[in-house]
């Protein structure tokens, strides 16, 4: 059986530093749906790009990599409620119908609500996307102008059909405020985010702050082979400023392509724009001087951490190039 892979798709640059709040890897899950006879709704939340396997059928018909409902024979429409992996502000939507050609929905709308306790009884759903026409086998990017914090979304498809992937791009809302608790201040679920990077040819630096260890080499930050002097770097913002007690640099799955060394610079800045940070970052003080890397290994540093006060941003320098899977900054949230 031949397997077709989704065509390459370049996300609009404005969304490169946003988080997919509906990513199953960070805990997004389907709560309820009207129907998923042909293909389970949870497939729509997978990180991997959709595939099409020719001649693959199951007991319900043609196997499809996404959410697909049966043909509607009465009035109405289909819907799916998703709990976001982390609450946050929604900046954009990607309703992807890749490989759904004669079975894509005619149109779709999306609503969102805030229900931190998970109880959706009596919640107020806000319209994020009005009913909008969809096309076959393509990405549909919709920008959202709404500053509210949301925990759940409801995708409505009219009247029925299939969606390969649903991605909800936005900024994580930080809920942790305990100043005595030690936590990963850089973690995605705690509000960490990517600001800028020198290169992301093989893997995006947003993977550095994902939960758990990397599942493969593609689940990390990897740059192209450097053919000129210098090194690669990325700038990240902590979810909350704090003082760092322990650093972890994980090169899981990187064996012939791990960097020779990694160093970390840091700074505390209030109200700085992302554009301001990039040229200033090369002058930030070192939090961790260049450390030699090993392949496929978790490197832990405590005594090597240099004296510092609270920090809000870091710059990771990967010398000269290569790939790392995860970076963890364990510490406590700074008191105001």
Swiss-Prot record:
Gene3D superfamilies recorded: Galactose-binding domain-like
Keyword Hydrolase: yes
Record-listed E.C. numbers: 3.5.3.4
Pathway annotation: Nitrogen metabolism; (S)-allantoin degradation; (S)-ureidoglycolate from allantoate (aminidohydrolase route): step 1/1
Transmembrane segments: none
Enzyme class, first EC level, given as a word: hydrolase
InterPro entries with a match to the protein in the record: Allantoicase (IPR005164), Allantoicase_dom (IPR015908), Galactose-bd-like_sf (IPR008979)
Family label: Belongs to the allantoicase family.
Name listed for the protein in its UniProt record: Probable allantoicase
Keyword terms of this UniProt record: Hydrolase, Purine metabolism
The organism's place on the tree of life at top rank: Bacteria
